[in-house]
C-alpha cells in the first residue's frame, strides 16, 4: 500500500470517529498529506495518528489534534488567519487550502522557517508567508485576524493575540504547564468586545517560547 492510500485510510478513520466533521477539513487533509511535511525517514510513519519528530527538537502534531483545532477554528474562504508556530508547515498548508487567501505563519526557530518553506514549496503552496519572529507577540502588520491558531502551549493567553483578533474573531490556543500538559482553549472576542473562553479539554504541546509565553 502506498503512502497516499495509507493516509487516505487515516482520514477516513478520523471522519468515522467524528473528528473530521467538515468537507473543508477533509479535502484539505487529502490535498496535503502529512508525509509531504516530514523528513524522508519519517514518511512511512506519517499516517499513524501520533506526533512525529521534525528538526530542532520539535514535533508535528498528530493528525487528530490538527483536525480538532481546524474544526474548532471554523475556517471559511477569505478569512485572515495567523498561525503561531509554523513547525513543518503542514498546518499552514491545510489552513491555506481552506481560506484560499494569504496565510501568515510565524516561527521563532530559523531552522524550522527554512524547513517549512522547503516543504511548502515542494507541496506547491504559494499563499503561506512564513515569518521568523516571536509568535507570542502576534504579527501586527497583518492584523486584525479572523482566526489565530497557536500550535504550542502557553502559560496564559497572550494579550497581544487577543488584541489582534477582529470583533467576532477566535483564538485557538493550548494553555497550561511547560511540561506537555495543557487545556485547549477557544477564546472568542465578541463584537461587543467581551471575551468568552471555552475549554476543549486536555492536550499536550511543546512550549510556546517568547515574551508572552515561556522564557527559554
From Swiss-Prot:
GO terms for molecular function: protein-L-isoaspartate (D-aspartate) O-methyltransferase activity. Signal peptide: none annotated. Keywords: Cytoplasm, Methyltransferase, S-adenosyl-L-methionine, Transferase. GO terms for biological process: methylation; protein modification process; protein repair. Its main location: cytoplasm. GO terms for cellular component: cytoplasm. The active site is at 61. Its EC number is 2.1.1.77. It catalyses: [protein]-L-isoaspartate + S-adenosyl-L-methionine = [protein]-L-isoaspartate alpha-methyl ester + S-adenosyl-L-homocysteine. PROSITE patterns: PCMT (PS01279). It is an enzyme of class 2 (transferase). It is found in: Cytoplasm. SUPFAM superfamilies: S-adenosyl-L-methionine-dependent methyltransferases (SSF53335). Catalyzes the methyl esterification of L-isoaspartyl residues in peptides and proteins that result from spontaneous decomposition of normal L-aspartyl and L-asparaginyl residues. It plays a role in the repair and/or degradation of damaged proteins. PANTHER family: PROTEIN-L-ISOASPARTATE O-METHYLTRANSFERASE (PTHR11579), PROTEIN-L-ISOASPARTATE(D-ASPARTATE) O-METHYLTRANSFERASE (PTHR11579:SF0). Belongs to the methyltransferase superfamily. L-isoaspartyl/D-aspartyl protein methyltransferase family. NCBIfam families: pimt, PRK00312.1. This is Protein-L-isoaspartate O-methyltransferase.
Amino acid at each position: 500500500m502506498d503512502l497516499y492510500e495509507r493516509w487516505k485510510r487515516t482520514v477516513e478513520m478520523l471522519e468515522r470517529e467524528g473528528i473530521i466533521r467538515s468537507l473543508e477539513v477533509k479535502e484539505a487533509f487529502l490535498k496535503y498529506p502529512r508525509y509531504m511535511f516530514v523528513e524522508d525517514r519519517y514518511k512511512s510513519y506519517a499516517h499513524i495518528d501520533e506526533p512525529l519528530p521534525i528538526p530542532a527538537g520539535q514535533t508535528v502534531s498528530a493528525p487528530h489534534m490538527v483536525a480538532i483545532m481546524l474544526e474548532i477554528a471554523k475556517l471559511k474562504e477569505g478569512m485572515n488567519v495567523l498561525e503561531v508556530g509554523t513547525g513543518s508547515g503542514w498546518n499552514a498548508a491545510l489552513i491555506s487550502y481552506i481560506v484560499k487567501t494569504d496565510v501568515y505563519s510565524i516561527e521563532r526557530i530559523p531552522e524550522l522557517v527554512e524547513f517549512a518553506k522547503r516543504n511548502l514549496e515542494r507541496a506547491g503552496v504559494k499563499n503561506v508567508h512564513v515569518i521568523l519572529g516571536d509568535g507570542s507577540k502576534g504579527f501586527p502588520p497583518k492584523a486584525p485576524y479572523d482566526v489565530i491558531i497557536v500550535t504550542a502551549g502557553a502559560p496564559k493567553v497572550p494579550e497581544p493575540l487577543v488584541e489582534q483578533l477582529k470583533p467576532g474573531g477566535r483564538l485557538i490556543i493550548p494553555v497550561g504547564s511547560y511540561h506537555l500538559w495543557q487545556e485547549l482553549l477557544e477564546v472568542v472576542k465578541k463584537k461587543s468586545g467581551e471575551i468568552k473562553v471555552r475549554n476543549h479539554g486536555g492536550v499536550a504541546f511543546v512550549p510556546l517560547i517568547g515574551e508572552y509565553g515561556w522564557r527559554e
